[in-house]
Amino acid sequence: MNLLEAMEQRHAIRAYTDEPVDQAILDILRAEIDACNQESGLHIQMTTGLDDAFLGLKTHYGRFTGVHNAIALIGRPVRDGAADGHGAAGTNEHDAATETATGTADPSVAVDTIPDGAAAAWHKAAADEAATDPGEIALQERVGYYGERLALRAVQLGLETSWAVLDDADAAEHPWWCLHPGEKIVWMLAFGHGARPGGRRRSKPIEELCRIPDGMAMPDWFRAGMEAAMLAPTSLSQQPFLFTLHKDGTVSAEAMEGLFAHVGLGCAKYHFEVGAGRENVRWRDTAASGEEAAGATD
């Protein structure tokens, strides 16, 4: 199964069976997590075979059952000068030689604490507000980009997945994850063997999700990228993103108003790159150029 097929196959599955995931598949996922951490600077961790990988915590949306396996998407707000939100290589803030990012944390070992004033996890009240801090925005987009990469890899391996936000994850008594100073759990990925098939997927029209210069026919590669982006997961299927093709062939993408919009944008950008072909995509650095992404006709 290639990535485009995995995008079509992927559905949000919130109920799982007790069938364990094969060890060979888990090893592949761990290797993919290590690669994502190395490229992105995130601190993604995985646990398997628990009675409840969500530790009894409430989820921000949806009811989950039988979640024995999960991936914690962990990071800290991106510092000035770091790579853009989809996490180019060279931003790793952790020493892979001195830690095992994908191992299950020992509950008997004290978890690193977070400095005063830094939240360890998103809370519902804060989640309903649009992120405005550039470092937080970059973190959310990066989590979306690399989290969706992992979700699609799991689908390729024959598993089902679903994104989830755990309310009050910082209050868990015996967390299997380890937070370094300043880090937070941004999202979770549940995965395993689904107990039931996924439902129908809905999407906005492509014309509402992208813009191209006046008088230009939409290039095939851009259309393919948009068709892939339209399959990306977003909270409540809101699709709060807008892609713009500029006259010079560069592409910009922005989060619109919506719940967890920047995480959804990261997912959509990963899909877009896969669909369009990474060799065809040149992202516009609007911050550096001082030009607005909305200038589709510039």
What are the residue ranges of the model-derived segments?
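Acidic, surface-exposed loops and disordered segments
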Residues: 1-298
